[in-house]
Amino acid sequence: MKKGFTLIELLIVVAIIAILAAIAVPNFLEAQTRSKVSRVKADLRSLATAIEAYAVDNNRVPREWNTGQYPGDPQVNGQPVSGILWWGISTPIAYITNPYIRDPFQDKNLTSPFDEVTFTYHDMKTRAVDWFPSSTFWPPAYGFYGAWRLGSVGPDRRYTHSCPSNSAQLLYDPTNGTVSPGNIWRSQKNSDVQPPAPLNGCL
């Protein structure tokens, strides 16, 4: 007569499986997040190359997409949205081959037409010189970051407005935790923006 498992033995097996899962799952999720961060930085590098190529041909960086300047700008509730389709650097000249580049960490708080649902882009010179010349943020930021900057919401999946002004976002720093507040940025003068930055860690 074969003897089956006792209840205690089954509970021990279940407990062992639970312990192994508790160890493996967080490590898997952390590795997945690190992989997405690497992908974001690679995509930002590709976009940066396209922006610089556009600037060489046109003597200026692309304008911000939410100005509605480009035909075919994507719309949400009748308003142009920045960055869903990179028309300016994909049409009519294809500085990038894929105009549908999306942020792996898309903003989970899409509540208004001007919230970003993919990588954000700032024409820093236009903001500093034409739009907000009296701002305490944009002119110094233009001097620090150069003519443009690109950004991702980062692993916390939201643009973090916790700085001295609503125009500034916290920088993502993996030493604060793989999933921690902060955004991933790349700019003309900073190939991979890392803390510290102007305005007490704001960007």
Label each residue range with its predicted role:
Residues 2, 39, 142-145:
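A generic fold-level signal
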Residues 2-29:
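N-terminal single-pass transmembrane signal-anchor helix
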Residues 9-16, 53, 148, 171, ...:
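N-terminal hydrophobic or amphipathic segments with adjacent small-residue motifs
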Residues 28-78:
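Conserved hydrophobic/amphipathic alpha-helical signal-anchor segments
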Residues 58-203:
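Low-complexity, acidic interaction segments enriched in glycine
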